[in-house]
């Protein structure tokens, strides 16, 4: 019985880590798909969608069961820089729109340096980087 308990104490954390990596990979894939759908919308209508509902993705949830976050800077108006996600130097990650998942903790803050943002799955550099905010 002690051997089974020991094996379980080793296997469960490994399994949980694998599940979390799979959720992150799924969020990254979803963001790539959304990015492609946003680009097709922009080509067709010569503007970015105001929200994800315009590309029929308003109810899409991330792997942690939270909605994906999207902000079109054109729709946000002149104060968009205050709402944009920012890197370690407080420079906006993108110049047209932000798209991200709030990650496992379901919380986020504008600068990536905020503790709540570390597990966010972000799109930065106009899609040149999609991954964990903590890795950017």
Where in the sequence are the language-model features?
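Extracellular/periplasmic head regions of type IV pilus-like filament subunits
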Residues: 36-95, 136
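Conserved catalytic core of two-component sensor histidine kinases
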Residues: 1, 28, 35
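Conserved short-loop catalytic and cofactor-binding motifs
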Residues: 3, 22, 53
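Short, surface-exposed interaction loops/tails
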Residues: 76-136
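N-terminal single-pass transmembrane signal-anchor helix
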Residues: 1-16
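Short, histidine-centered active-site or binding-site loop motifs used for metal coordination
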Residues: 19, 38, 103
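Aliphatic-rich helix starts adjacent to a transmembrane/signal segment
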Residues: 14-31
